[in-house]
Curated annotation (Swiss-Prot):
GO biological process: response to stress
Gene name linked to the record: sprT
Amino-acid positions noted as binding Zn(2+) in the UniProt annotation, renumbered to this chain: H78, H82
Protein name per its UniProtKB record: Protein SprT
Organism domain of life: Bacteria
UniProt remark on cofactor binding: Binds 1 zinc ion.
């Protein structure tokens, strides 16, 4: 498990929550699903991801540190639910009815697809672009694609091509 400068108390709280919800699910489902691998390697604005084939949960250490309580209460069960749904039902829609059922009926957690954490500290630089109706912020990756002539982006509202400001 990679720690990425997270206090041990936070890592322990994550493990407690993971084990608590896994035990709860195993009891309700009458199964003995194993504990998933846990790492703190998620980057960017995603709070976490569930890797089905490797049965692993990757958590964002920056967002975890900045939003510990809500993160542990919501994100850990959210990602665990993806793995449990995959084990229980096979490959289904990521946030479909099976996942919602697993979250609400089995894990007892509200089924929310996205987090509401402040992203300023993990958001990368953006580049301003304009169209007829508004200003847009393009990521470094999209900006570089425009500069290299590999992509053209259009406004979803007015349809005009975006131009660097």
């Amino acid at each position: 498990m990679k720690t990425s400068r997270l206090p041990i108390a936070i890592q322990q709280a994550v493990m407690r929550r993971l084990r608590e919800k896994l035990t709860q699910a195993n009891l309700k489902l009458g199964r003995n699903y194993p504990e998933p691998k846990l790492s703190y390697t998620q980057r960017g604005t995603s709070a976490g991801t569930a890797w089905l084939e490797s049965y692993e949960i990757r958590l964002n250490p920056v967002l975890l540190l900045e939003n510990s309580e809500a993160f542990i209460e919501e994100v850990v069960p959210h990602e665990l639910a993806h793995l449990l749904v995959w084990k229980h039902f096979g490959r289904v829609a990521p946030h479909g009815k099976e996942w919602k059922w697993m979250m609400e009926s089995v894990l007892g957690v509200p089924a929310r697809r996205t987090h509401q954490f402040e992203l300023q500290s993990v958001r990368r630089n953006t580049f301003p672009y304009r169209c007829k109706c508004q200003e847009h912020q393009l990521t470094v990756r999209r900006h570089n694609r425009v500069v290299r002539g590999e992509a053209v982006y259009r406004c979803v509202h007015c349809g005009e091509q975006l131009v660097a400001k």
